[in-house]
Amino acid sequence: MTKITVNYTVDVKDIQPKHVRSESNPQNQNKIRRAWVLSLSDNAMEVIQNKIKSAPARHAYYEAIDREVSNKWIELMRKHTTESLNAGAKFIMTSCGERLEDDYCGNADERLIVAAQIVAETIAADFNR
């Protein structure tokens, strides 16, 4: 049986939307899907398709993974905010609302990739049993 592995070489540029009409177009769902798909080995979709034969069931599984990655991403972002505030960070006002001051700002897409890789590890473990 072919094993699923986790790809730890995904970069922020890999998950950016390719065809966006405007910068205000929300692309988080696309980034979430790209992040976890790219975090799995090339054979992962074939292994999943062989295990979950029904297309509707497989699509429901993919949506569940999307939710799991999204929830993990939010968890990591909240953890970063809490740790930053505990370390003395302050919120500043910008034209878009409140955010952490520059010294504590991080790249949200990097945290998304970490979240996707954490979920990918679970997927690999589940399918490699």
From Swiss-Prot:
InterPro entries, per the entry: Phage_T4_P15K_Rpol-bd (IPR019725)
Gene Ontology biological process terms, A to Z: DNA replication
Pfam families according to UniProt: Phage_RpbA
UniProtKB keywords: DNA replication
Top-rank taxon, per record: Viruses
Keyword Amino-acid biosynthesis among UniProt keywords: no
Function in brief: Binds to host RNA polymerase core.
Protein name as catalogued: 15 kDa RNA polymerase-binding protein
Species of provenance: Enterobacteria phage T4
